Structure formats: C-alpha cells, structure tokens
Amino acid sequence: MKPYKIPESVLVVIHTADLQVLLIERADRPGYWQSVTGSLDAADEPLPATAARELYEETGIVADGERIVLRDWHMSNVYEIYPVWRHRYAPGVTQNTEHIFSVEVPRDIAITLSPREHLNHVWLPHLEAADKCFSSSNAEAILQLPNNTKH
C-alpha cells in the first residue's frame, strides 16, 4: 500500500521579471491550472528542498541558487483538502499547510512537464494567471507577487 501523503506542502509561483506567471494544467483534472505544488516526502524534509524538488520534477527547472533562486516568502496557508483528494491522506486528515515560495526565471527558459502530472503550460500576466487558477490560495499568492519580488 502506498504511504499516506504528509499534509504539509509547498506552492512555488514561477514568474519572469515582468510578472508573467507560468501555470501548469493538472493531468488528473484537465482544466485545473496551478503553480507548482507538492507535499513533503518526509516529515523532516526541509521546505526549500521540497520546493526545489517539486520545481524540478514538475517543470524541469533547476534552482541552482545563482541564476535561478528560490525565494521563501515565510508565509503559509492552511486550507481544507478537497474531498476528492482526501483518500491520499491518513484517515481524519482534512487540512493541509501550504508554504509559499517563488522563483524568477528568464522568459525563454525551457519547460519540461512531467506527463503523468501535467498536460500543458501557459505564461500569463499575473492578474490573468490569478484568475485562471482553480485554487484560491494559489490565486492569492500570485496576486501578492508584486510585493514579494526583489524589484
């Protein structure tokens, strides 16, 4: 039996200097667009390591710490896990804590999706990207992007 997911995750908003935001479409829910997300693999996995791992697994982008730098917003959201996904968690778990990160990338960066996880990707101005997200916490993070960039 597959182990239960840990109800702690990361959200990584990928953007360009001019606030174009990358969204990816879920393979298990076509039409559901989001930023990179993913749960900790182990309870002691550091959050920045989770963010870097998920960024690479879902987009092929490597956060090298020099050209591509993950920014920890030191913010988190607690939200209800959608009922359709609760079977992935231990019985009785209904909430997840999501930690927010962002990463600025060049506009021409190559994107390599994980086909089992995502179908398509699109770059959109941040306000349009926020409107397209199915998750309200993801949309809110994108709306806060202008206040959480190095510019």
Task: State the predicted function of each range.
Residues 14-17, 26, 103-105:
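Active-site beta-strand termini and strand-to-loop segments that position acidic
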Residues 141-148:
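A small-molecule sensor/coupling module
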Residues 151:
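Catalytic cores of nucleic-acid ligases and guanylyltransferases
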Residues 34-37:
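A short gly/proline-enriched turn/hairpin at secondary-structure junctions
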Residues 40-137:
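Unchanged
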Residues 29-32:
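A conserved beta-turn-beta hairpin within the catalytic core of GNAT-like acetyltransferases
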Residues 1-21, 43:
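Conserved N-terminal beta-strand and adjoining loop/helix that marks the start
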